[in-house]
Curated annotation (Swiss-Prot):
Zn(2+) 1 binds at residues 165, 177, 237. This is Vacuolar membrane protease. It comes from Emericella nidulans (strain FGSC A4 / ATCC 38163 / CBS 112.46 / NRRL 194 / M139). Zn(2+) 2 binds at residues 177, 212, 310. The lineage of its organism: Eukaryota, Fungi, Dikarya, Ascomycota, Pezizomycotina. GO terms for molecular function: metal ion binding; metalloexopeptidase activity. Residues 38-382, 459-464, 521-524, 672-684, 733-953 are vacuolar. One of its GO terms (biological process) is proteolysis. It comes from the Eukaryota. Glycans are attached at residues 53, 115, 779. Residues 570-599 are annotated as: Disordered.
Amino acid sequence: MDQTKPPRRNPLAFTPWPVTLITAVVYLAFVIPLLVIHHVVPSAPTSSPDGLNITEAWNDLQVLTAGYRPYNSRQNDKIHDWLLHRINEILGAAPPATTDEKKPDVFVFDDTRSNLTFARDNLAVYFEGTNILVYIRGEDDDQEQWWELPEGSPKGKGGVLVNAHYDSVSTGYGATDDGVGVVTCLQLVKYFTTPKNAPRKGLVVLFNNGEEDFLNGARVYSQHPLSRFPHTFLNLEGAGAGGRAVLFRSSDAEVAASYMRSKHPFGSVLGSDGFKAGLIRSQTDYVVFEGDMGLRGLDVAFLEPRARYHTDQDDTRHTSKDSLWHMLSTAVATTEDLVSDTSDRFDGPARNDHKIASGTGHQAVWFDLYGSTFVLFRLHTLFALSVTLLVVAPIVLLLTSIILTKVDKMYLFRTSIRPEGSLEVLPLYGDRGVIRYPFLLGIPTAVTIGLAYLLTKFNPYIVHSSQYAVWSMMVSVWIFLAWFVSRVADFARPSAFHRVYTLTWTFVVMWVLQVIATVYQDRWALGGSYFIFFAYAGTFLATWISYLELFALPRKSEYANHLRPVSRHASSHSSRRGLSEEDEEDEDEAPTESTSLLGSRQRTTFANYVRVNADTADLSDSEEHTQDVNVYGLEQRWSASLPKWLWLLQFLLAAPIVLILVGPIALLLTGSLHQTGQDGSSSLFIYIAIVALTTLLLSPMLPFVHRCTYHIPLFMLAVFAGTLIYNLVAFPFSDSNRLKLFFIQEVDLDTGLNTASLTGVQPFVHDVAVGLPSAAGQNVTCGPFGDRFKCSWTGIPPHVLTEDKPVEEWLSFEVSRSIDKPRHAQLQISGQNTRACKVVFDSPIKNFHVAGSAYDPRFPHTYAKGIKEIRLWSRVWDNTWTVDVEWFNPDSSSDHSKTSGSLTGQVVCLWSDYNQPGTIPALDEVRQYGPAWIGVSKLADGLVEGRKSFEIA
């Protein structure tokens, strides 16, 4: 057959245009839907399902978010009363029982009795709750009202708890934090009191108050008798302002299985690992229910955008009915599955003393696929599969290599071959491309890391508003450099083994990553590395196919014998050249009209060396002009036997699985972290995370990128140039992506001096502070405050009392030292128009007691190293707290001993009600005169703190 006759074009061949088009189409086909799903919330139904009313829920949300409702505000009391009214309305409108369907019994508890003292590290809290509980009795529940008995306890299987908190921060309307959760709970009451939806197991719906100020409401719930009934829970939260509700924590696989009922699942176990590893520092009521009380449950929350979280943009204008429906539908589906479960999997020995006997489950791995399918399996299953594949995959590749060697088809790593019965050495060039991978991977990755440091130095917060500009910059330069390096390598040393060597290197790297991931799975129960396992499996299969592909090659001995019958001219020419590509050039043929303008088929490299197809050096003059059309370019002649379409199978094994699993993680991680720099988190971390994710997402194209045409890489170069300039010079904040600054005003009630301050990142916080009218002409002082800077100035005096009184009357306290007990004293503290005060000690105290307080061994109220601060919360206004304290012996060897027996500190009261204009003029001023690109949030529990000093001699 005439090898010079061009074959019919194969649309799947490993040639530039098919590779370019297929690679681009596959990446776009998987990435675009991910972006759409991440940013577009499923539409709410036009008509409400039976037992639910979306319009009613939206109207409730508008009422709920009419004002700021922190625990320490009058608006909070109004919402408490409104919730009781709405619950009674819903129960009154519930459909009546029928002959076939029984209406469940419902009990509403307005808990104005429970209180608790607890401590965490050197901070102690006394809290009086105003939680509202709705108990919908299940068909299988104990029919007695056991909670009314002095020692009453529930019988039978445990129930289900659904929780949302109805308080908000003092600077935010709390539409998603946690208004959507609250109205979802109201709809759950409506749904499960409909006779046909009556639960098998009892349901407790908790509207807790005080979450924003240290998870106080959830902790005090533990003191209600009904808290002993639920064994599982669903916590509804918000740490953003819209979008999809994300499942970001689950205690085990068994309870996570109930989430599978959700029509639009969304989330990854990687979020749970972030909490375990301490990367996410904020907490929700989940840690109280699961960690302190021993329940097993789920944490579902809105996570982005963080710029609106805890600000006045967390309102109904910036969320939607679609977001409301996403959380509501998820809650209904999950709760319905939990209350229908009659198995014993949520019953068993308590994990610790005094905790709920809910048994133990199995660590879980979960993630969603394109927002429609929920994948769930146990962590030990992932561990077993990981260990198995870590052992099996290298063995399979090793055995395949041995078989290839046995059948004389192992061309890999072979530079030459000596034909049998001959002293002549013939080149194979099978080692070409073996060391390319470190450069292919290392150069693009190193450059993107350099860009991460460049942005951190010159414009660290650009990711706050322009995360996709950062992504575009990283992706475009990575693609261009990977293509450029591979093309240079392919130009200088063309090799048909580029794919197999690159895949082999990738396999080795993935094997190392899988070892690390498996160790973390075993030691720290972190399942977020699941994507590494699947990527490793895909890489292994693609690599194995490359090795199996070698069986299509001729035996090396046969190939060598094919090369032997050459002319003496070729032999002498070959011996002159040896095996090096850098030997002298062939003598140029005489030019004719048909001669190429470049002269023969040789090419000159950048070092002025001749680029020659090595195999043509071993051919006779006649054979040299008969190039096999099945050989691509100047690659090795034996590559003509390799299949031309297997690359597509390898690409489909390696790339899509990475895009499907790593893509959502990249979007979720970016969405939840790109605006955390304003909170003091490292900007470099998010940039390095983007670099790592870019490398993971694009590395599957490395075995194939050298075949791509120049069109897309050059376009990527243009994109890189534009985005680099933008990312370096653009202002990082905007009206829709505001910088969050944190406000507090501190008043010295002994002297009347007040200091207003803003806390945030430099230089922006200073620029905002000095631009305020009241700060004009003042020396605005800025200094480090944790990971941020705090800028202070003398502010406009606040008006936090309902009537004008001297500041020294805002709070009062009396101190009396015990006569018969050394180092004991009693403080009586009262604040005007507030129900929150605290005592801050200059040195830690040993012990304390608040009159009327309850104690619970699950919540220790002391700390071995002493207590520095006691926070006091009352459900009534203008309350007087009585606090007995004991401090350390100054003569003891304790680290906290003082040189004298005195105790010093400050009594502080808080004011957080910002619903009336003019109450806190300094905050009004920041909002009125601050630039449009800032948002204001609270720095501490109170917007205004008034303090007086004390000394107990």
